[in-house]
Design a protein with these regions (language model features):
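C-terminal motif of bacterial Sec signal peptides marking the signal peptidase cleavage site
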Residues: 15-18
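Peri-catalytic and regulatory segments of divalent metal-dependent proteins
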Residues: 20-157, 171-174, 191-207, 212-228, ...
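Surface-exposed amphipathic alpha-helical segments
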Residues: 121, 254, 389-429
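N-terminal "mature-domain start" segment
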Residues: 273-306
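Secretory pathway targeting signatures of secreted, lumenal, and periplasmic proteins
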Residues: 295-342
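Signature of long, low-cysteine stretches enriched in small and polar/charged residues
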Residues: 322, 339-388, 392
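Primarily a LysM-type cell-wall glycan-binding module
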Residues: 419-449
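Extracellular LysM carbohydrate-binding repeats and other cell-envelope/extracellular binding modules
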Residues: 451-478
Length: 478
């Protein structure tokens, strides 16, 4: 289970068309807001700096951290692994878990998706399976071997093309091997959770919940939900149905055991399910930052993804928007800076005014990359920062669509003190329905769309009838 950061995705999607700022220490919106803050928050474990830089900050809830570590230590006692290990919750809204060094991490986004302690044990056990079998080291050695072979092939044949071919084929084989590692980690994690006294079907129900969440994410993007069960030859993970099928033949998968659902729900009750305030909040198709006091509104069909590096917006027609801010000094006009510093140099550069502030708008030079559609760059001065949008539209409707994206960039504005003060993270609450129907519970959610679908996915059920059978229900409150 590996989560991806936004910047590599931006480089892949935008390529040379991205509005690339000079590399002399730019500061993102999130890092600007968080500048000067200490490494550890109250209640959060202090991680080694190099590990926190890689995985993200820990969540500031001492009781929840202790609870998760306690479940992990219970599994570790069954694993027979030497050394000491820590289990920690990361302050990230995405659903994920992974292991690094002597740490096993779960995100609060994953905790929100799970239904009981047994499923948490399944997630932690899966990652202990990776650690116990030294999968990370195996992959690193295998990857280096592939790269060495590629270099040797290029030298012997005198052909860089041959070297690239060897590297490509070898890395694909390595990815296939990675799928075997995932299935092995499922088996080992299953054995651990059963020996620790948890229900054996928790591994399957964990995978099924992650599958449902992935299907819902695809639905939000207008994609086919069943595509989550299809994988290509280049996939780094087995498809969920492949993992579920592999578990069916293992007797332990049906072993009885504890769920500890009440204790689990009590531990996550009140947990944030939102972005951290220093990174701003996504509210439907709006981005609002309470510390920088800025915001903008994307087109209605856009899905926004927030990250410490910036905000990525993806439209149903695969149009793209990327937003961030920098404290890099930009003397003179923004139009002049854009003309002299951005490469390739934009065309049709216009000075503009957005939110009563200086702005500049430019276009990608025609012919600079025929593989891309319409690209626009929008820069706005905001106090001692410059905020910028990279906009991309492809397809037959790209000319009209790019103007829609520019109009979205023009919604950039400064939030009032009252607006900023009113912004708080959404939180998970565990409630007793007390006769409230699924429709009534769904209507209370603070989202503008897919209310029922969100409620069902959050509780890991397929329909309202299944939800009605739950004695306690998870919901989201502002």
């Amino acid at each position: 289970m590996v989560f991806r950061r936004i910047l590599p995705l931006i480089a892949l999607l935008f390529g040379v068309a991205a509005c690339t700022l000079p590399s002399n220490a730019p500061q993102t919106a999130a890092s600007a807001a968080a500048a000067g803050q200490g490494a550890g928050q109250t209640g959060a474990p202090v991680l080694p700096r190099e590990i926190e830089r890689e995985v993200g900050p820990p969540y500031a809830d001492a009781a929840l951290q202790a609870y998760v570590d306690g479940v992990g230590q219970k599994l570790l006692a069954q694993a027979g692994m030497g050394g000491s290990y820590r289990f920690a919750v990361l302050d990230l809204p995405i659903a994920n878990a992974h292991a690094m060094s002597n740490y096993v991490f779960v995100t609060r986004g994953l905790l929100a998706s799970l239904d009981d302690e047994a499923e948490l044990a399944a997630a932690l056990g899966h990652e202990l399976g990776h650690l116990g079998q030294h999968h990370a080291a195996q992959r690193a050695r295998a990857r280096q071997g592939v790269l060495d072979a590629a270099v040797e092939a290029a030298v012997v044949t005198g052909s860089p093309t041959v070297g690239r071919s060897v590297a490509r084929d070898g890395l694909l084989a390595l990815r296939r091997y990675s799928r075997e590692q995932e299935l092995e980690a499922d088996r080992l994690g299953l054995s651990l959770l059963v020996r620790a006294g948890y229900r054996g079907d928790a591994m399957a129900s964990l995978i099924e919940k992650l599958r449902r969440q992935s299907q819902f994410e695809l639905q939000l993007m207008g994609e086919a939900p069943d595509s989550v069960d299809r994988r290509s030859a280049t996939s780094t993970h087995p498809a969920p149905v492949e993992r579920l099928t592999a578990l069916e033949g293992i007797p332990e998968a049906q072993a009885p055991g504890a769920t500890n659902r009440p204790a689990y729900l009590a531990a996550i009750n009140g947990m944030s399910v939102d972005d951290a305030p220093e990174e701003g909040f996504v509210r439907d198709n709006k981005f609002l930052h309470p510390l920088l006091k800025i915001g903008f509104t994307a087109p209605r069909d856009f899905r926004l993804f927030n990250d410490q590096d910036g905000v990525l917006g993806v439209g149903r027609d695969h149009s793209l928007l990327f937003f961030s801010c920098t404290k890099e000094p930009m003397p003179g006009s923004l139009a002049e800076w854009m003309r002299n510093k951005l490469k390739p140099t934009p065309t049709d550069i216009q000075s503009a005014e957005i939110d009563d502030s200086e702005a500049a708008i430019g276009a990608r030079p025609r012919g600079s990359d025929t593989g891309l559609g319409q690209v626009r760059y929008v820069m706005v001065r905001h106090g001692d920062q410059v905020c910028y949008f990279n906009l991309l539209s492809e397809g037959p409707d790209r000319d009209r669509r790019i103007e829609v994206l520019v109009a979205a960039a023009r919604t950039f504005r400064t939030l009032s003190d009252a607006e900023a003060a009113a912004l708080h993270p959404y939180r998970l609450r565990v409630i007793t329905p007390n006769g409230a129907s699924a429709a009534q519970l769904a209507q209370r959610l603070p989202y503008g769309d897919f209310k029922m679908e969100r409620l069902l996915v959050l509780n890991g059920v397929d329909n309202a009838a299944e939800l009605a059978r739950l004695p306690q229900v998870k919901t989201i409150e502002p």
